[in-house]
């Protein structure tokens, strides 16, 4: 048997010099160009007259397995290890950022920022292999600058902090999301 992605098969008889017959096979060379999934019977004829003998062989053309690598995905470079899921299970993952091909572990930090083509390959019980790809976009972290350290007096006077890029969100004790801070005691915040 062969897989449907096989270009051609040359049938070989034990005794050369005979003739092949059957749908699509070359009579002299025994070359059959694979076109469709199914069973194909070919006859080999050798000899002449009362010494004419024939034999048949069946070639099975197996379909490729249907393989899915999933939908395209995006991760931040610091997202940590991600598990890719393909179907059917039991295949192998390859590509930049894959750190364990059999379990589909993808590390965005290893891949780095950019768009990466990841391949999932699967071999079925007929030894037919097929694959699918998924695009994984790894986004780099934005540059963020909270500005210079600032010394304030312990007075209830609000100060608006500024960072770059603008329109970020501030998080901390005594500060609003918009960056307004009112001192409330001595110390470092």
Protein language model regions, located:
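Proline- and Ser/Thr-rich low-complexity, intrinsically disordered segments
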Residues: 1-189
